[in-house]
């Protein structure tokens, strides 16, 4: 099997990709625990040559660039034009000269052999059509023994930040079918046995998964959190198609979930759960 990521490329270059680009700073705040855990697990340090897969708006890219300093390099790749544009803007604003962005599909991009010491990804590798093929192609891009660290979601039930608003609104919306557990999507790497199998079959070794549990700030105000949930993720399209009473009821149900998870400081937080996956190139 080979990768046909056409659907994902279309999706991330649609209005959805534009929305993620608009929320770049908020997303980095939400997922900062994952960023730190991935960079620590990869042991990114001064002088490293880093490849950032599915870099999105460049949050992990910029964080890695700070660690490698000017004598290291970070190459970042993503299929989303809107997010790559946003990432470049952010890198330019930070006067970074050791960062390169590539608008392309990492699954079959012709990286030169031995170009990198470290491979990192924050939530960017769960969308490959054929992940074993993708990781088999990526392996030679690292020096032998090069280290990979990936942040990937655990199961839906362990991620209330994503699922509780959906469950509350579902009775009032026409939701699309749930993807299968191994179909491309946010939870396709939730099964640790599958992750180990994919990486082992594609030539990686010393594979390990460590759990990361944390709280995700969906917004610093109730209004911000509600706007984020309505514009991003699985509820954005169904909410855009419904009108009248069902739309009102769906928004009321989402609001109730967010209110129940608002702290005394006004910040809306729900729990999230990831695997931090590490391995070495064969």
Feature annotation, model-predicted:
Residues 42-44, 68, 142, 262:
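A generic alpha-to-beta junction signature in SAM-dependent methyltransferases
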Residues 49-109, 133:
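Class I SAM-dependent methyltransferase SAM/SAH-binding core
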């Amino acid at each position: 099997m080979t990768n046909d990521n056409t659907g994902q490329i279309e999706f991330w270059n649609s209005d959805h990709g534009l929305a993620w680009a608009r929320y770049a700073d908020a997303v980095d705040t939400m997922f900062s625990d994952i960023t730190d855990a991935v960079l620590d697990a990869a042991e990114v340090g001064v002088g490293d040559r880093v490849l950032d897969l599915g870099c999105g708006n460049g949050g992990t890219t910029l964080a890695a660039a700070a660690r490698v300093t000017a004598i290291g390099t970070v190459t970042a790749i993503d299929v989303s034009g809107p997010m790559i544009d946003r990432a470049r803007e952010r890198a330019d604003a930070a006067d970074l000269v050791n960062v390169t962005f590539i608008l392309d599909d990492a699954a079959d991009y012709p990286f030169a052999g031995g170009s990198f010491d470290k491979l990192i990804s924050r939530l960017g590798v769960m969308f490959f059509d054929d992940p074993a093929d993708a990781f088999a192609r990526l392996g030679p891009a690292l020096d032998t023994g090069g280290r990979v660290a990936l942040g990937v979601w655990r199961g839906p039930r362990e991620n209330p930040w994503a699922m509780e608003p959906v469950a509350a609104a579902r009775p009032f919306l026409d939701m699309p079918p749930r993807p299968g557990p191994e179909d491309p999507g946010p939870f396709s790497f939730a099964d640790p046995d599958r992750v180990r199998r994919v990486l082992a079959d594609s030539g990686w070794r010393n594979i390990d998964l460590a759990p990361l549990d944390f709280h995700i700030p969906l917004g610093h105000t109730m209004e911000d959190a509600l706007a984020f949930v309505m514009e991003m993720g699985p509820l954005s399209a169904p909410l855009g198609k419904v009108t009248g009473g069902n739309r009102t009821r769906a928004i009321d149900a989402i609001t109730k979930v967010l209110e129940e998870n608002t702290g005394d400081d006004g910040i809306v937080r729900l729990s999230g759960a990831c695997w931090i996956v590490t391995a070495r190139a064969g």
